[in-house]
Amino acid sequence: MNNLFSTTKELISREEKEKLISQKGLCIWLTGLSGSGKTTIAKNVSYELHRKGYLTQVLDGDNIRLGINKNLSFNIEDRLENVRRTAEIAKLFIQNGIITICCLVSPTEEIRGLAKKIIGQKDFFEVFIDTSIEECEKR
């Protein structure tokens, strides 16, 4: 017996949730090389937004891989699955009005496109952290 159900309409709409906390949910997707500063930037952006009264959630790729994605490797299929799971989690936060900052290497356009498709174009803001490979290697 299949106990999975399609997504049902919530009793409280996204708009009502956003109104309650006086903000719109969205995703800031930070991408870049390992060691480029994604996590540091995400934490600082989250801190500054919090100081201004905004509710945020940081989804850090390293932390996600220590928990829900600990069974994944770094081959292309598992990288896609890592991003898929993270984007699905981000979408849940966004639908509740939370500004969600994701920081994942997400090295290919295909991988980032998957995240954008799951989250939705209007809620997805991609930021490439352009740090030289030499600087990343130092960190």
Regions found by a protein language model. Give the residues of each.
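GTPase G-domain guanine-specificity segment
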Residues: 137-139
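Glycine-rich phosphate-binding loop of ATP-dependent small-molecule kinases
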Residues: 1-103, 107-125, 130-135
